[in-house]
UniProtKB/Swiss-Prot annotation:
Substrates-to-products reaction catalysed: acetylcholine + H2O = choline + acetate + H(+)
Role: Terminates signal transduction at the neuromuscular junction by rapid hydrolysis of the acetylcholine released into the synaptic cleft.
Species this chain originates from: Oryctolagus cuniculus
TM ranges: none
Taxonomic lineage from the root: Eukaryota, Metazoa, Chordata, Craniata, Vertebrata
Annotated localization: Synapse; Secreted; Cell membrane
Residues annotated as glycosylated: 266, 351, 465
Topology in the lipid bilayer: Peripheral membrane protein
GO BP: any one term: choline metabolic process
Name the UniProt record assigns to this protein: Acetylcholinesterase
Amino acid sequence: AEGREDPELLVTVRGGRLRGLRLKAPGGPVSAFLGIPFEEPPVGPRRFLPPEPKRPWAGVLDATAFQSVCYQYVDTLYPGFEGTEMWNPNRELSEDCLYLNVWTPYPRPTSPTPVLVWIYGGGFYSGASSLDVYYGRFLVQAEGTVLVAMNYRVGAFGFTCLPGSREAPGNVGLLDQRLALQWVQENVAAFGGDPASVTLFGESAGAASVGLHLLSPPSRGLFHRAVLQSGAPNGPWATVGVGEARRRATLLARLVVCPPGGAGGNDTELVACLRTRPAQDLVDHEWRVLPQESIFRFSFVPVVDGDFLSDTPEALINAGDFQGLQVLVGVVKDEGTYFLVYGAPGFSKDNESFISRAQFLAGVRVGVPQASDLAAEAVVLHYTDWLHPEDPARLRDALSDVVGDHNVVCPVAQLAGRLAAQGARVYAYVFEHRASTLSWPLWMGVPHGYEIEFIFGLPLEPSLNYTEEERIFAQRLMRYWANFARTGDPNEPRDAKAPQWPPYTAGAQQYVSLNLRPLEVRRGLRAQACAFWNRFLPKLLSATDTLDEAERQWKAEFHRWSSYMVHWKNQFDHYSKQDRCSDL
């Protein structure tokens, strides 16, 4: 059918020509351009290295099918169970995985249209833009936006870091994301998208990624608004320091017998050896580098390297100027439950998970792995219902709150308050609807990750058997998200009768509940619990110094050192641009 090619499905980008495909959606067709390469494959000697833009290709590239998923750990906790399998890779694994997908209305928009860019979660060790739950056709058809989603390197491939080395500088998974954002700036206009109106959105580690781009100046100019769903860059799991990053990288090397001979070689030899190891070997040993038995902790994550991140996320948030930024943030009703079945004693999806007091105490140590004895005591004190200190259902729910508050709700609340206080316009939500189709048990409530299917409009697909109310609810949510992408405000511009979603401020702390009922405005995102995590616990720790003296000094030193290094780097860059450097 060469002569009858649909011109709507042929697009020319900087790298060359693309052929997409037309897809049916409820309400009309959309165009999809799947598996567009944006980066040279990071294979062989390029493993662990920062990305290089894709070189141009000849002819018309076929962009009609998803490409490989980045090499990653595959979850085998409950084989064949829908609740875990939906997050597992749905394409073959490969290190040659740096492709992105673009969904656009059919026919293409004639005037520049706001762009939504999705960053998937998965603890920085897993995830893919091709998962069914991120299917772009419903949102694009319903709201007429352009949607882009990239793959990025995860696990050891994306986040192995030997600080100071060129061979494994760390954070290359975030640099993959940044390169995709640069690709959007250069190419999205060809799809009808507006490069001057780009909204990043992501969930969990994807939301943490969105936040890290907010805090990294070279990324900041590549987008205009941000949505953080159930994750934040200041979460205790989202970054590590350079010392811990090096410890994990060298331990991984030891586990895969690098360098052979066992003598501690230099970084260059170590990385050269790691590059010879099959991808699966690295994945197989990935989890063994964590410092403690823990849940909601991941081995290879972004590192505070003084480059992508000039300081800790918390310090950057506190120091930042966020004038003119619009942000939408939120959490689900039961952030902690999903993680408990992955290692908290006494928990399973196949029973009520009633736990004993002893299991609760042990669970706190796994759920707050870095806590001193005293800090763990404080957590137990705060979360015990002292009228019913042995009640198994209450203890189960309390441990879920510990894990959810510590890792998601309170970091998100802290971020929202700081951004609002420093000039951003912030909208906040709690997502409270448990899908009628959910396969996880009732005690898990509305688990981490289960708002996504509604934001992407899956209930519009009749074969998925959602209810009519859920279909209407999904349409409402897509409208909020798309309004936010268009204007920076989720409210309907034309409909003053609809209940209004007010901005979140540090003082009033207003947020909305998202469920099948109309919007309801509430105040305080778990304000009491978050005062414990965000105000009291840090004081307790600095007073008792489980941050032993050495670490406290190290932290103070690091602040001095990082500002000195930034100064030195500027001086050196200035010097190296002078003539005398080139003819040595």
